[in-house]
Amino acid sequence: MNVERSELLAGIGQDALWALIEGRHGDPFSILGPHQSGGMTIVRVYLPGAEAVDLIDATSGRVVAPFSIAHPSGLFAATVASRTGYRLRITWPDAVQITEDPYSFGLLLGELDLHLISEGTHYSLSRTLGAVAMSIDGISGVRFAVWAPNARRVSVVGDFNAWDGRRNPMRLRPSAGVWELFIPRLAPGERYKFEIVDAEGTCLPQKADPVARASEAAPSTASIVASSTPFRWTDDGWMKGRSRQDRLEGAFSVYEVHVGSWLRDQKDGNRSLDWVELSQRLVPYVSDMGFTHIELLPIMEHPFGGSWGYQPLGLFAPTGRYGTPEDFAYFVDRCHGAGLGVILDWVPAHFPTDVWGLARFDGSALYEHEDPREGFHRDWNTLIYNLGRNEVKGFLIASALEWLERYHIDGLRVDAVASMLYRDYSRNEGEWIPNQYGGRENLEAVEFFKHLNSIIHERCPHAMTIAEESTAWPGVTKPPEQGGLGFDIKWNMGWMHDSLSYIEKDPIYRSYAHGTMTFGMIYAYSERFILPISHDEVVYGKGSLLTKMPGDEWQKFANLRSYLAFMWGHPGKKLLFMGSEIAQPSEWNHDGSVTWDVLDQPQHVGIQRLVKDLNGLYGDEPALQFGDFHSEGFEWAAADDAVNSVLGMLRYAPDRASSVLVMSNFTPVPRYGYRIGVPSDGVWIERITTDAREYGGSGLVNGAVSSEPVPAHGRPVSLSLTLPPLSTIFLQGPSP
């Protein structure tokens, strides 16, 4: 090596030089960029594949100094008299590139940001980590940052550097284990990943950005630099008017949707609709049907479509399958414009093992537990988040807030809560590790949920959290300060299983299972419940709701009408999966579409009209809302008539300002002159009967029924009703 080349490499040891060349150097700024040496400034760049490099004046563009080859692998260096503003003119075999030097910029992240990341309390994580399009000193570009504390070297790679991890190694901020680099002249839309060398020197498969706000559509896996331009929302009225308390007290009827299979364009390769098309088709449909909310199965970026989104890897990015993040924001904006709230299914329980994802992200068990007895979920072959690690808790909470704050989401339904609460969930003896007290409770998960809900309700007081929790864990919807987990609503899985097992029976045998339909009221007010007839009940060979019903075709439809109306009359908020509102004959297929063509048949139209009318009555009548969460809003009118398989419920508005009687006859035998005691003397008006001809029924109706001074069911007055076969009826009580 000649003297001139030695001067260009002054202060750089052979080990450091070879570490840079081989892509193992953890401190590239110690070699690259401008450095003072003997009163001069040496600028070094490492650009494998470049033919020549010139240092040019940032203002005039004139060549200040050509770079010399400091090492044939692609290390160039130039010496200048002063450290003034400069740019690089790089000659590649097929192009000339002019850019600022990424290694001329100082520290990027503030110490407070780093402290909050380590503490797990940086709740605006996507504004710090990930790829942020921004300007520094008037120079536009993208700041990249990623948490990888156990890595030896991290580089950002993309089309902009031919996916060569040697070109853009990042700077480590050791206090937080975060790596950072600003690359000038990059813009939103660039594809990128991180290339990581682990502590043992092994170069890992290139990793997608855990905090990316946009990603390629599957099966491609690169992250995409998202726009930093805020979306122009038009939902100010909705945002100012929404109230979590109002939603909890009022009508709450949810239409659950798998975006990719709600409707497909058969004229265009059977493709799923995108967000803009869904805004034009799905939003007006759900609004017209009278639902108050749309709940979307997970739309966070996920590699495997067959997981329905429940195995996500991009917890900050709407999946690229249906459009851009801006398209998704537009969809939410249109929902709000139509008076619909938006709930997202959100999955903090586990993540898939794809090598380009979070699994052993920096060569260590970073996001997951090291021990598979804590870190591997056998049911789903997925990895479990380590909630005992501050950075992981902060990552998850920041993800939740991202959807609520950036995308104006109205609520999160948290998936698989039970799997997080129990250390022995779906594990045999010896396959799990007890907590510090020897118990099965996952204390880290308990504290996580308490903190998650507290932070959400503090920062987004309008937002709701809903737990899919399938056990009897106490206090799921109690505030954390009262020892609860802090959710607003819990799925009532018990009611769902009991009621479906009952309605699937032949009516001959229902009298023996009568208690399964009344049992739910024993615990109905122990939590704030929603009654879920979800996607899980119409898949994996379970059949559709319609095919669950016993009997011939007429009886199947009658059973379904009666069941749905019973659900709407029963205390608890409502959730119905797409397709069930039209009595879809086949079970759900995520690769297909709702079978909308059945609406050519009147019996399916009848079910659809019934659901719309049930939503309308639910929304109009406070008596059907108040008792959802308040025991004083409900009484059994008839709970013990197992012989006739008849159930009667009385629903009351606050202060009993209004009342509704709900009667169900779950046999194919009409009941004439059925006497039922009522609390109010006067005329009771039939608002809905599922046996109405417009719903596909036989047309047995009650109309207006006057009470009679005949005691029944412990009440001094009663009604003599006609209960049509396999039906549910709603009667409005007289004004007090």
Swiss-Prot record:
Name the Gene Ontology biological process terms: glycogen biosynthetic process
Q: What is its EC number?
A: 2.4.1.18
Select a single GO molecular function from the record's annotations and give it: cation binding
Keyword list (alphabetical) reads: Carbohydrate metabolism, Glycogen biosynthesis, Glycogen metabolism, Glycosyltransferase, Plasmid, Transferase
Q: What class of enzyme is it?
A: transferase
> Active-site positions, per UniProt?
415 (nucleophile), 468 (proton donor)
Catalytic reaction list:
Transfers a segment of a (1->4)-alpha-D-glucan chain to a primary hydroxy group in a similar glucan chain
Q: Which SMART domains match?
A: Aamy
What cellular-component terms does GO give this entry?
Answer: cytosol
Residues spanning the signal sequence = none
Q: In which pathway does it act?
A: Glycan biosynthesis; glycogen biosynthesis
Q: Which residues cross the membrane?
A: none
Domain of life, source organism:
Bacteria
Record text on subunit structure and interactions: Monomer.
What does the UniProt record say this protein does? Answer: Catalyzes the formation of the alpha-1,6-glucosidic linkages in glycogen by scission of a 1,4-alpha-linked oligosaccharide from growing alpha-1,4-glucan chains and the subsequent attachment of the oligosaccharide to the alpha-1,6 position.
Q: What family classification does the UniProt entry report for this protein? A: Belongs to the glycosyl hydrolase 13 family. GlgB subfamily.
UniProt xrefs under PANTHER family: 1,4-ALPHA-GLUCAN-BRANCHING ENZYME
The name of this protein is 1,4-alpha-glucan branching enzyme GlgB 2
Which organism's genome codes for this protein?
Rhizobium johnstonii (strain DSM 114642 / LMG 32736 / 3841) (Rhizobium leguminosarum bv. viciae)
Gene symbol? glgB2
